[in-house]
């Protein structure tokens, strides 16, 4: 079956004058050609993922490259059977990547155009993975790591990327004197984070140029030493990386069986991303905890039209009960 849709992943750090106005112009153009996706535009640059048919995505790439600021912008292209997005969003933000540092932190202003880690090609990164003296650090959110990661990479004890700088500071004595290489989905987070590590005093910091997305497409490494799938922030959720010897590393939240299917916890005040089968999603009413399963706002209940009696019976089947307030 031919794949008629292209998904474009890209970013570029470059100063953009009147970025807020440019974001509005950018959105108008994207809508005029029927493009779908999500784009962030800030004073420091642009970061986006978009999808459309061949003609639409080609028009978009030509439009972007026609701007002198983005004439050399690197598009990473996936071919798919279906659209990766349902709508088109272009938003102006203060930053395209937020490190989560305090406003008074002297390292708060990280400019990757001035300070960033050394770029590693996929081949060089693979060599780093095999080097016992090199620390490989995953800079993504916890749920991204759980779906797939490089073999031997460290999973920081964090929930999201914004917590990573503090985690690195808390563990500085473990890594300061070692070579550290970092990676993320497409490279945009690592550009800034590796620069922050250099500012923190790390002497030997590297980053996977182009991110996991590029590593999986490299004709020489072919994604080897990647385990699981790569989490992406669109309708696809998970994409293949390892084309040599792929394995499943994701585990069902409820029973630990191999799983690569993500859902959000039904409790809107939790919304945690969890891996689970369709069977367990229904069994546990899409709640990641007893509290979430019995929460009065659990979206699974309304989405599936469960009566309170049916809801209570589901919970009783797993040894739980609705709270008195919800009974």
Curated annotation (Swiss-Prot):
Kindly state a single biological-process term from the GO annotations of this entry.
tRNA modification
User: Where does the record place the catalytic residues?
Assistant: 184
Concerning InterPro entries, the annotation shows: Rhodanese-like_dom (IPR001763), Rhodanese-like_dom_sf (IPR036873), Rhodanese_C (IPR022111), TrhO (IPR020936), TRHO_N (IPR040503)
What does the UniProt function comment say about this protein?
A: Catalyzes oxygen-dependent 5-hydroxyuridine (ho5U) modification at position 34 in tRNAs.
Q: Which reaction does it catalyse?
A: uridine(34) in tRNA + AH2 + O2 = 5-hydroxyuridine(34) in tRNA + A + H2O
Asked whether the keyword Cytoplasm is assigned, the reply is no
Origin species, per record, is Streptococcus suis (strain 05ZYH33)
* Record-linked PROSITE patterns: RHODANESE_3
Documented EC number(s): 1.14.-.-
Q: Which CDD domains match?
A: RHOD_YceA (cd01518)
Pfam families this protein is in? Rhodanese (PF00581), Rhodanese_C (PF12368), UPF0176_N (PF17773)
The reply on keyword Oxidoreductase is yes
Stored SMART domains: RHOD
Can you tell me which family this protein belongs to?
A: Belongs to the TrhO family.
Q: Name one GO molecular function term.
A: oxidoreductase activity, acting on paired donors, with incorporation or reduction of molecular oxygen
Under which name does UniProt file this protein?
tRNA uridine(34) hydroxylase
Occurrences of domain Rhodanese (ranges): 130-224
Keywords, comma-separated and alphabetical: Oxidoreductase, tRNA processing
């Amino acid at each position: 079956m031919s794949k008629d849709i292209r998904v474009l992943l890209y970013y570029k750090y470059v100063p953009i004058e009147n970025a807020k106005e440019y974001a509005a112009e950018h959105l108008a153009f994207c809508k005029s050609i029927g493009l779908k996706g999500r784009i962030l535009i800030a004073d420091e640059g642009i970061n986006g993922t978009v999808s459309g048919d061949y003609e639409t995505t080609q028009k978009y790439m030509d439009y972007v490259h026609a701007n002198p600021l983005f004439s050399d912008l690197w598009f990473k292209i996936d071919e798919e059977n279906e659209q990766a997005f349902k709508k088109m969003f272009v938003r102006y933000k203060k930053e395209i990547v937020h490190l989560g540092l305090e406003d008074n932190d002297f390292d708060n202003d990280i400019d990757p155009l001035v300070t960033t880690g050394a770029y590693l090609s996929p081949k060089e990164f693979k060599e780093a993975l095999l080097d016992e003296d090199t620390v490989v650090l995953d800079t993504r959110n916890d749920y991204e790591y759980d779906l797939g990661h490089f073999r031997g990479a460290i999973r920081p004890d964090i929930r999201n990327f914004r917590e990573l700088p503090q985690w690195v500071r808390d563990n500085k004595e473990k890594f300061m004197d070692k070579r550290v290489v970092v990676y993320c989905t497409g490279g945009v987070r690592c550009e800034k984070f590796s620069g922050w590590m250099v500012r923190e005093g790390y002497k030997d910091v590297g980053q996977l140029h182009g991110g996991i997305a590029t590593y999986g497409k490299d004709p020489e490494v072919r994604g080897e030493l990647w385990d699981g799938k790569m989490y992406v922030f669109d309708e696809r959720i998970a994409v293949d990386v390892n084309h040599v010897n792929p394995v499943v590393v994701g585990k069902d939240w409820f029973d630990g069986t191999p799983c690569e299917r993500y859902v959000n916890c039904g409790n809107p005040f939790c919304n945690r991303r969890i891996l689970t089968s369709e069977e367990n999603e229904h069994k546990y009413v899409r709640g990641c905890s007893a509290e979430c399963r019995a929460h009065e706002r659990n979206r699974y209940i309304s989405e599936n039209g469960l009566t309170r009696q049916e809801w209570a019976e589901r919970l009783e089947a797993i040894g739980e009960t609705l709270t008195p307030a919800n009974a």
